[in-house]
Swiss-Prot record:
Keywords: Aminoacyl-tRNA synthetase, ATP-binding, Cytoplasm, Ligase, Nucleotide-binding, Nucleus, Phosphoprotein, Protein biosynthesis, RNA-binding, tRNA-binding. This is Methionine--tRNA ligase, cytoplasmic. The modification Phosphoserine is found at S825. Gene3D superfamilies: 1.20.1050.10, Glutaredoxin, HUPs, Isoleucyl-tRNA Synthetase, Domain 1, Methionyl-tRNA synthetase, Zn-domain, S15/NS1, RNA-binding. InterPro entries: aa-tRNA-synth_I_CS, Anticodon_Met, Glutathione-S-Trfase_C-like, Glutathione-S-Trfase_C_sf, GST_C, MARS_N, Met-tRNA_ligase_1, Met-tRNA_synth. GO terms for molecular function: ATP binding; methionine-tRNA ligase activity; tRNA binding. The gene is MARS1. The keyword Cell membrane does not apply. It comes from Bos taurus.
Amino acid sequence: MRLFVSEGAPGSLPVLAAAGRAQGRAELLISTVGPEECVVPFLTRPKVPVLQLDSGNYLFSTSAICRYFFLLSGWEQDDLTNQWLEWEATELQPALSAALYYLVVQGKKGEDVLGPVRRALTHIDHSLSRRSCPFLAGETESLADIVLWGALYPLLQDPSYLPEELGALHSWFQTLSSQEPCQRAAETVLKQQGVLALRPYLQKQPQPSSLEGRLVSNEPEEEELATLSEEEIAVAVAAWEKGLESLPPLRPQQNPVLPVAGERNVLITSALPYVNNVPHLGNIIGCVLSADVFARYSRLRQWNTLYLCGTDEYGTATETKAMEEGLTPQEICDKYHVIHADIYRWFNISFDFFGRTTTPQQTKITQDIFQRLLARGFVLQDTVEQLRCEHCARFLADRFVEGVCPFCGYEEARGDQCDKCGKLINAIELKKPQCKVCRSCPVVKSSQHLFLDLPKLAARVEEWLEKTLPGSDWTANARFIIRSWLRDGLKPRCITRDLKWGTPVPLEGFEDKVFYVWFDATIGYLSITANYTDQWEKWWKNPEQVNLYQFMAKDNVPFHGIVFPSSALGAEDNYTLVSHLIATEYLNYEDGKFSKSRGVGVFGDMAQDTGIPADIWRFYLLYNRPEGQDSAFSWTDMLFKNNSELLNNLGNFINRAGMFVSKFFGGFVPEMVLTSDDQRLLTHITLELQHYHQLLEKVRIRDALRSILTISRHGNQYIQVNEPWKRIKGGEADRQRAGTVTGLAVNIAALLSVMLQPYMPTVSATIQAQLQLPPPACSILPTNFLCTLPAGHQIGTVSPLFQKLENDQIESLKQRFSGGQAKASPKTAAGLTTAGPQQIQALTEEVTKQGNIVRELKAQKADKNQIAAEVAKLLDLKKQLALAEGKPLETSKGKKKK
């Protein structure tokens, strides 16, 4: 046999890996040819890879060649593998061809490349995690694994295109990539050039047609590929039939909440926001909103949960703000603490306690940790060269200095950190420094300060991380940042400042100094807990019984992952350290950054004045949560997500399910006689619910939200296929079928109301009130889909959950929050803003689908009111499409009255 491959031809990867697996089973000569060489004489265009058999026949399909090698090695075919191969050819390959073409030939990056394949990657990840198997077809590697690995390798070998949140896919890919046949194949084809090795080959390929709409819109219909076993169906049906009786008893409420031996005790913190800043949407999603979702989920799981946060009130920033506003630091703290609390209250953040750091408990606990570190030799004294403003007659703390960043040249870098490149800075390193108060140029002078001896504590920190990180849910960016700090070597870190507003340093000779915020801000979690309960040590000196989850943006990782653990380990007082450090990337605003001074972006105190409910803000921010990479808030996208995902998908299904109960069955849930198809639906929903649990337990908040929308789509499809509004008018069998469909649908709505609770608590409560969901079912989320609304249950009054966002409303808000960018914003016809091609394609498909529904109803001479309702939906979708395309809306001419 002779195998012809070509360097830079992606199809050569899987066949070489498969050939390596069959090594020694037959004589094989491998020849490298150019991509334009005609190996197969009867093909009209060049094709590689090609396998020439001993018989003289040729195989020139990648999967056929790989199958041949696997059969040689004794592998037996199975249906699931064949299904994966069909899917790879029809769905994955077109998407990958587009992604690789965009990346290699057109030089695109980021979501432009990942977008076409995101749906396919999510499907692979979902399938792997749901089956709980390491490989696609089971416990052992199969032909499907090699073919899909080879197809994906050129793209995913760059870690930035392997989404960290797709954990099962990540593990599968790394397992295969580490195998010797796969490594040799990659070396042969890519020649250590990475994906650029494919350029000569891809440049000769036709430009791919637009695939985004078909491949990315909405979510993959997993049920088309999922193979349900009889056992899975039986388990799902048995759980359904047990209903409410299978729910555990509600946890008794505690006040205060304290750890309980033998239970899962979950302590959750959000990074403490600086009191002097009004939080913008990026601050809210990065810390408090993400933590709130997990806290609400923890309570639904009946875990013993305490969720804390508070304002960080000491430090230079507060003194600076006090000067700007002509107030004392304490007055500034009092004023802005109330602003923060009001904002989080409006966003429905469910803190058990929201405190502050300007308290006696903060002083006591911080000074105690310092004294313990000092006594154990972990505090150093040294002279520091500092900037002093002679005009203001004082040393300038970091935030009182601005200048040019020595690393990236950013002209507005602070004396502690550059907001552009993110690097930490010593104030004296700034170029062209200026006093922030008087704008004069400061001089360099010496001052005695205290340092935390991080090098001396490094071994303890590394030992702790080695025990903590495996099996934990630290996000990838948090792991990377911590490893970078350790790799570069820890350095002594100054923990004092020449300020008045802060925790006093309890050491002779340093009475005129305070602790630096990096040292004592993270101790704020402890003091806030101490203000909540005098038994705070049961949470913070109890590492054996407490799971600590800390939520933050990535710039806070060093202080939570290095500085505080070093202090706590050095204090040797059995402190609870972070078990799971959850860090987000950054949320930008449209095409730029949030800026209060320039009036760009939505800040927390402004959101409530937009007329958009808090739950809609929560939904969109969580849907767009910057998990693996930075994301951006977009008004156009917010309109689209509200009108498509909430109004047309989720809200439409829940409203229809409830209305059918009210309209057809007098408000009482009808009897349900489940068919085999109904039982399969039960099982699909149970599996999706379990996937939701798996995701949230791993704190993959954004992906779990998509599970809710997937279940809602299942429900909409179920209603559309079974047409209960028609069956209710038929004979006894049809009416019974209408009852079953309606009863099952309204129970799906009840399940969704509980799954929604962490994300949209007000909407969740509204649904539960409309359905009159029994109290235990409102507060507990089981792992199986249960019948919580049995036959005979009476529901309440059903009404729509969501309102449509209009384009003129959103355009007005966009202009309002655009600051100086408003004048420069390019506009399309009639001043409208276009949506992205993915959204336009999705709307085009919805218009086509709805048009078919209208034509079908007219052909069947259905009820006029029903036709009118569907026509109204069609017109509304057409309007959304026109707005998305930036076209002026046509004025309806209507029919002339006679």
